[in-house]
Amino acid sequence: MKLKTEQAKLNSILENRAHRGICVVLEGRDTAGKSSTIREVTHYLNPQKYSVHLSRKPSRSTMKKWLAYWSKRMPAVNQIVFYDRSWYSRAMVQRLNGWCSERQYQNFLAKHKSWEQSQGVHVIKFWLSISEDEQRARIERRKKSPLTYWKFSPNDENALSYYDRMTLLKERVIDSDWHIIDYNDKRQGIYSLLETLNTTLENLE
């Protein structure tokens, strides 16, 4: 019931208030719950009011013009976009897997703040936080479940071996602008994120 109350509240905010474009960035480790969170948060929203961007491994041409690529995927006025991973992939997943060069990585660290400010949109950022033990348990459930085994890939097991390194990488970019949400209990995490999102939207100028 509490979740439905917050879902209805988000719908009301987006329907009844004029606003600049809103970016809702969801970052987190593999299995943290980014996709399922977006499904829950958007469940009752008017499809004309929002869109979802799923980030996958980028092409070489996209890698070379990383921030320019994302500039074309910003929300319009009175629109909200949910990002299942985002431009911050450069500093985390890409860096972790060696997909970007040292120069590309350092360039992102130097420019991403000013780039965000230049977009003319509100950016609300969430880190979905899970422990190493919880990530391991979720990967095992994914691997063994007849409903989710198809999602399992070698990247999932690699994620466990890179847990500490990912922690270091995310700490280089996650600052006071971010909302860190405990996702060890995913259902409670979704509620906390949605409640935080609604409060943040209500306080936007």
Would you name each region that the model predicts?
Residues 1-22:
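Extreme N-terminal, non-catalytic leader segments
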Residues 58-61, 86-89, 129-136, 184-188:
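Conserved nucleotide-binding/hydrolysis micro-motifs of P-loop NTPases
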Residues 95-106, 120-167:
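A glycine- and Lys/Arg-enriched "phosphate-lid" helix/loop adjacent to the NTP-binding pocket
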